[in-house]
Swiss-Prot record:
Cell compartment(s), UniProt: Membrane
Lineage, opening ranks: Eukaryota, Metazoa, Cnidaria, Anthozoa, Hexacorallia
Transmembrane segments: 25-45, 69-89, 487-507
Family: Belongs to the ST7 family.
Membrane is among the record's keywords: yes
Entry's Gene Ontology cellular component terms: membrane
Primary location: membrane
Classification via Pfam families: ST7
This protein's name: Protein ST7 homolog
Membrane topology: Multi-pass membrane protein
Recorded superkingdom: Eukaryota
InterPro entries assigned: ST7, TPR-like_helical_dom_sf
Family annotation (Gene3D superfamilies): Tetratricopeptide repeat domain (1.25.40.10)
Amino acid sequence: MEHQGTGIFHLGAPFLLKVKQWVGWSWTYLWGFWFLLVIFLLYILRAPLRLKENMNLVILFLNTLTPKFYVALTGTSSFISGIILIFEWWYFRKYGTSFIEHISLAHLGPLIGGGDNTAPNSSQNVAECKVWRNPMNLFRGAEYSRYLWVTGREPLTYYDMNLSAQDHQTFFTCDADETSSNSADTIMLTAWRERDQEKRINAACRAYECDPTSPTALILLAEEKAQTITEAEWYLKQALKTSDDLIRNGASTNGDGKEDTIHRKNTNVCVYIRRRLAMCARKLGRTKEAIKMMRDLMKEFPLMSVLNIHENLIEALLEVQAYSEVQQVLAKYDDITLPKSATICYTAALLKARAVCDKFSPEVAAKRGLSPAEMAAVEAIHRAVEFNPHVPKYLLEQKSLILPPEHILKRGDSEAVAYAFYHLPHWKQVEGAINLLHCTWEGTFRLVPYPLEKGHLFHPYPGCTENADRELLPVHHQLSVYPKKELPFFILFTAGLCSFTALLALLTHQFPEPMAHLAKTSLGWISAPFSLLIQKVEDFFPAHILHQLTRI
């Protein structure tokens, strides 16, 4: 019996689902036919229902009403509409959506729309707003501080610098520093926790005086005290000598927990120094040297892929226009199992666009259609724009750039700023790439009409990016928000209805006779098509058929 009940339930569920879908379909497409059918039945049954007599009574009642009644009626409706408008506006400001629209979509939509009840995995619906270290972050002393001196604007937020302080404590300190025989390690343990920049630099100077070969002290001086990239490179080269010795001496650890901790710290320090040295070489124009250093670093420390050194390599390869080598890097890192980034997606789009953009013409494409290569380029652009929709406005120079933050949010405005800051010249040096992007990027939004609910090639766009980007980007930057929060239709409709009825009430109160004449004229215009339709129906059907129908 239990199995039979289960079988009946499984057989009944598809039937009920089909009935529900049929009802939803009928409400979607047949409401017009039903409306005409009701009008036709009312016309046929006008004699039994005494519609003409009842209509005359209604007209007589309306004729006895004074203008003051209409003023009171419109005033009351305006008052009610105003209350609805205020409530809708409060609800929209608090929850970001219209109350009426929310109720319609959440409760009425499933009843009459026949929507799909299958809910995807919550882990795919809710994207975690994870903050990542910017692989292309600048030097504070040589770049960020100079920007502050020139403009008087803070390039970094407190939240961003606080995240960097946490990263520095993770990379450059360990528990063994508290009991280290080297006083420089103890001083730097305190220096990395210091929030004030001047105090950090002073602490690093004291550690440098105690031990001129302290790698972490030299790193802090290179990052924050050095006023030029050349000076920062000098500090880092001094730190690398000691760091390499520490790595070689600690390679043969006997498995002791303390020694392993120190070795992990020394490894982090060595990787960081070599990476920053490669970035210094890139900034000073020695791009080929920087490429070699990055390749060696990725080869020697493959487990450090979490630092996204490949993004530094891609940018350097684009600088020397080594597009085939860039394609090889993308083939390795543009994998479905690896986290995506704006650098990966937009570089793939740039390489696809490079093959066709020099001969691309929107007029010609509109006439003959897109070739397979052009279609592949457009699809790559759409894929990149879906991943991060903020980037195109920076590449098209519709928004001004600022210095990139030290941390970015994937798919957010902070990542777009960080990407465009370095890659805008690479798009410009490919002739026609900017033009192709300009002609095609907005087509992405037709593929993703509801980005917060459902994506096309990626998960739905996370709704938490706006708040996180506001914490990462400075106040003077105009934040790019996606999708744009436009006022819902119900709020606009309510506001228009409220304003229109209030205007009618005012005009009726000031000019009662002209407004009454205008109302009668308007009603005559509105009823004229219906009167003509009724006359056509009476002419079409024979009189005896209508007479027999009224006798039913």
